[in-house]
């Protein structure tokens, strides 16, 4: 068995050696099919390949040369473009047709405007007729327009405008410019009747000396007013609250801490607050207490800013002083009510002007003006 295998192996080796030294023979065929091929060593291999490519291109219409793809496009001619544009563009209307359309539209607008005006005039006429009918019906009822009651804008031709009231000795004013103080209730008590009012010339003379206007008293019929000429009495009324004098021992530290140093610290409360005699504001801060037994009501209550700016005093010192009297009891109060009772005009916010002239409070500034006025008089 082994000998047989050795023989077969030797035979295979011999056959391989014979094939290695076999001579290559070129074979040429006359067919032009795709299965025919030439040996690579033959001289006619390149020629047969070129012939094959040429024959393939002749038989196949889809054969393309190697290289980039080239596409041929056909552009339309200029004449065709113009023709297409003329077809796409709408036909232009003629001038005559355009004028006709404009004239028709104008005539339609004019007709609409005329119709609107006619309707408006008709509506106005109907509304006026209805209003006149309603007015005639209302006037037929008795007692509707009695007295001064009348419809607004409804005035007869015979009615005249109300005349202005004129007083004897007083020049009428048609210009809204007003240099003199208006006649108030408190001023009428001081000046008396309306016939005693000063004329414009006298008022102009007073305005020339406006520097001492704050300390000068108002004129009466016979001259300047005296202290005995004040019409309003300084007695307490029936509705005046009783005056309570608080001793110094009742003043607590909490009340002293509750004293306001400026107006921004004030808290307004109309039910629990107390009223300041100077500014008339009802706030919750601590006020002064007058120790004068003849004082009445809340006349001796002053807040911190008013007492400092108007009289140069402090609320704390006033509360701790058992003999402190309020400015009205001392006769130096410069509030608007007390000055009007004395026949003088109100000062307004005078603290800034007083500080501008070098004074610390309004009372010192008014006192200096009064001294200058008395020296000149």
Swiss-Prot record:
GO terms for biological process: apoptotic process; regulation of cell population proliferation; regulation of DNA-templated transcription. The keyword Metal-binding does not apply. The modification Phosphoserine is found at residues 193, 220. Residues 253-377 are annotated as: Mediates transcriptional activity. It holds the Pfam family zf-4CXXC_R1. A motif (Nuclear localization signal) lies at residues 163-179. Its main location: nucleus. Keywords: Apoptosis, Cytoplasm, Isopeptide bond, Nucleus, Phosphoprotein, Transcription, Transcription regulation, Ubl conjugation. There is a cross-link at residue 211 (Glycyl lysine isopeptide (Lys-Gly) (interchain with G-Cter in SUMO2)). The modification Phosphothreonine is found at residues 166, 199. Residues 58-113, 144-211 are annotated as: Disordered. One of its GO terms (cellular component) is cytoplasm. Residues 199-210 have a biased composition (Acidic residues). InterPro entries: CDCA7/CDA7L, Znf-4CXXC_R1. Residues 148-173 are annotated as: Interaction with MYC. Phosphorylation at Thr-166 promotes interaction with YWHAE and YWHAZ, dissociation from MYC and sequestration in the cytoplasm. Residues 76-100 have a biased composition (Low complexity). It comes from the Eukaryota. It is found in: Nucleus; Cytoplasm. Cdca7 expression is correlated with MYC expression in fibroblasts and is much higher in attached cells tham in non-attached cells. Interacts with MYC (via C-terminus), YWHAE and YWHAZ. Participates in MYC-mediated cell transformation and apoptosis; induces anchorage-independent growth and clonogenicity in lymphoblastoid cells. Insufficient to induce tumorigenicity when overexpressed but contributes to MYC-mediated tumorigenesis. May play a role as transcriptional regulator. This is Cell division cycle-associated protein 7. The gene is Cdca7.
